[in-house]
Amino acid sequence: MTPSVLERYQSAPQNPGVYLMKDKRGTIIYVGKALNLKKRLASYFARETGHDMKTGVLLKKVVDFDLIVTATEHEALILESTLIKKHSPRYNVILKDGKSYPCLRIDTSKPFPALEVVRKIGDDNAVYFGPYSSVQSVRSTIKQVNKIFKLRKCRDVQFANRTRPCLNYQINACLGACCNRVSRQEYARVVGDVILFLKGRAPDLINRLKFEMQTEADLEHFERAAQIRDTILAIQTTLERQVVVSTDRTDRDVIACAINGEKAVVTILFVRSGNLVGSRNYPFDTGLSGVPEILDAFVRHYYERSLFIPGQILIAEKIENHGLVQDLLIEKRGKRVSLVVPERGDKRRLVEMALVNAQKELEKNLSIQNEAWETLTALQTILGMSVYPRRIECFDNSNMAGTDPVSSMVVFVDGLACKSEYRKFIIRDAKENDDYACMTEVLTRRLSSTEAPLPDLLVVDGGKGQLSMAVAVLKSLGLENRFQVAGLAKKDAKLGEVYDKIYLPGRANPVNTRGALKALYLVQRLRDEAHRFAITFQRKRRSKRAGTSVLDAVPGIGKKRKQVLMTTYKGISRMGQATVEELASLPGMTLAAAQQVKSALALDKD
């Protein structure tokens, strides 16, 4: 700690607020909140000994701090969460889960809504379910819902333009809403059943359906009664696959944390109507924090973006801001939420179940981490690197017969793909068929940027030529001694070569990788991933360019109208044969827009 820090904390206000601790480079390394800023800072700086390990390590690096005063501790808690997400401080608990999870959506404002998969929650009147842990779990849920309830599966444009029942209706997998085979009222009732099912209220739904089945049977509507019976059986079959963990039919989430050094895993179990319906594991970098602090950060982060907050949340240990966090949950849910630390009984057994799952997941993660460490250490050795190759970047070019040239950058951190760091590049200046010039441009753009840290190892896809070009770029930017660069060339089977070859600057022969094949395979995975990423991006650009048509230049014809026209007529030729009146009758079209289309098609034909 510096003398200025000791002086400044003594003049800190005795108000609620947030403090941001900084190291000698001005980087924010810790963000915290306090009811009384002066007292909290005094707990750090008024004494030099008696701190826990995390605080001791932190204070050795603090040379400055900033303060933000808030009106209440509640506001400070919210601001703390916002700043942690923004700055990702080294010594805060960071949830390593930035991806958006898939959700299910039903837009009840539509007369015949479908079940959709989305990754963003819109500000609308639709009903959302999730988030789900994977695309596979979403598909499984959709498959169950479609099998039981038979909602429409076609897109809105197809639905609006269909003139006869689809194949799904013909095989009894759809209610046939597109061709008026089901009334709006009946479809709405089915949608209501789907919502109950997805909310975990299947027992309530079954009871109601049994009553309806009996009513239909009493009225001698035996066919309808049989349909309801089949629906009940399908729902019951689904429920049989779920594990009953509680008899009180309460919705609750169960959260526990396993920790080992700077790595942790939080497991959350989802209990709906007494059934264990799913779970999810979240890896954490602990920042040397303990379980209570990790659980505190997790509960705040998770439920801040969760679509559903149950009435009861069981946690393994009491968290630091227990009362404040519970108030935040109540505020978001709009009704009571209990944040409970069970001591005994069925609820404690649920917490222990979550803890066992967290420990197993952590053991798996640590095993993967240890294997990655061994591989990266071997790579460091064979490449003669002075630093551990924690961050590796690999670049690749792609084009189609010299057109639409692009490049990709993929990043592996600690031996694993870090997809949030991937970058795509559209070639701006280099000639389309000049691979060296394209790579020179991309490396120059990447290494001139300060948005991302420099890599420990940079790999280019290619042999000595590409490597020489990369070295030239590094020299031009004054980076030739900042990190290692290597080229990966494919084996030449005609020469009897068995393995791909890694080349280093200033060496005529490739690196000997026979004793470190795992290291070679890691570099190959990088190269293959860069190739995949570049090819995918190049294909998308090519498809987008190929997808342009005469309609793109027609005034008043946007994306939706173009989609309706192309879906209806399947091509420009058939569209040109339609009359203005036929064009104007399509959904979303007007007479003026139809006349514009007709004129444009006539000019295009000429």
UniProtKB/Swiss-Prot annotation:
It is found in: Cytoplasm. Its main location: cytoplasm. One of its GO terms (cellular component) is cytoplasm. Residues 14-93 form the GIY-YIG domain. Keywords: Cytoplasm, DNA damage, DNA excision, DNA repair, Excision nuclease, SOS response. GO terms for molecular function: DNA binding; excinuclease ABC activity. Residues 203-238 form the UVR domain. InterPro entries: GIY-YIG_endonuc, GIY-YIG_endonuc_sf, GIY-YIG_UvrC_Cho, RuvA_2-like, UVR_dom, UVR_dom_sf, UvrABC_protein_C, UvrC. Belongs to the UvrC family. NCBIfam families: uvrC. Interacts with UvrB in an incision complex. This is UvrABC system protein C.
